[in-house]
Structures are given as C-alpha cells and as structure tokens.
Swiss-Prot record:
Belongs to the UPF0461 family. Keywords: Isopeptide bond, Phosphoprotein, Ubl conjugation. Residues 79-142 are annotated as: Disordered. The modification Phosphoserine is found at residues 37, 121, 180. It comes from Bos taurus (Bovine). Pfam families: DUF5568. There is a cross-link at residues 75, 184 (Glycyl lysine isopeptide (Lys-Gly) (interchain with G-Cter in SUMO2)). This is UPF0461 protein C5orf24 homolog. Residues 94-107 have a biased composition (Polar residues). The lineage of its organism: Eukaryota, Metazoa, Chordata, Craniata, Vertebrata. Residues 80-92 have a biased composition (Basic residues). The keyword Cell membrane does not apply.
Amino acid sequence: MMHPVASSNPAFCGPGKPSCLNEDAMRAADQFDIYSSQQNKYSHTVSHKPMVCQRQDPLNETHLQTAGGRSIEIKDELKKKKNLNRSGKRGRPSGTTKSAGYRTSTGRPLGTTKAAGFKTSPGRPLGTTKAAGYKVSPGRPPGSIKALSRLADLGYGCGTAAFPYPMIHGRAVHGVEETSSEIKPPNE
C-alpha cells in the first residue's frame, strides 16, 4: 500500500507547482551552507597535497591528433623501421622464416634441424638420425650388430650349422620308435 509522503508544505506538491520547486531550491542552498561550515570546522586536519602534472611525450600527442586509419599506418611503418637493423628474436635476419635454418644458432649448417643429428655430437655422421643405427658408437662400423661378432667368436665354419643343438630328423616316420634315453642333451 502506498502512503503519501509528508512534507512541510500542507498543500500537495505536484510536478510543475512553483511553491514546491522554490522550497527544494531553498533546501539545497541550506545544505550547501551546512557543508561549507562543516568543512571549515575540520579544515585544520585535512592536508591537500598539490598534484604534479606530468607531460606526455610529443610522440603520443601526434598519435592522438591523427585520424584512426592513419595511426594504424604509422604503427605499421614503425614496426618495419624497427626490424630493419635488428635480427629476429632467435638470431635470424628479418624477412626470413624459421624453416630457412635460422631457428637456433647451435653451430649446425643452415637448413638442417635438430633431428638431423646436430643437437649433440654422438659420433654418427651428419644428417643421420638416431633411428638409423647410430645410437651408440663403440668403435664398430655403423649397422653392425654385437651378436654378429659373438657368432664369429663361436668358431662355426661355413660347413656347420650355426644352431648347436642336434636336429631330430623324424625317425618315427620311418617306423623306428625312439625312447627318451636315446636323445642326449648337448654338452654345455
């Protein structure tokens, strides 16, 4: 439920009535007088520090005065001028791409990548990868296997088989039965 707000004026103050407007103006002036007297009352405790105005660079002022489209062009020109004498962030000249070989400066020839074997020098030829059989280099030629050298040490000739266990040829197929006592395990 809505109740009318009581005011000091016994007549209803509606919009556009001059008596209400004048009363509001009087109240506003009275409030201002109270504020100024209160401010004088506490003025000894409040200290105002003078603000120091700082002047901006004239370069920024020119950017503010130019039109929106023109300022974009000026920014692009500044970027181009900035890169003329300087190289890129990873040591390659401006205008070149990372794929041109300027990605890092680790001593590799241009156009090569880390995967081509220039990350460290593990003893394999340049341009080969770890998967090409050059993972370790203990003095053997690349591609040789340790097992081949072990087989050579066993002393098998060309006429003998490299498999040292006796092969059982199917004697049971010919009708002769074998017992487990006849099969001898090899001497180790």
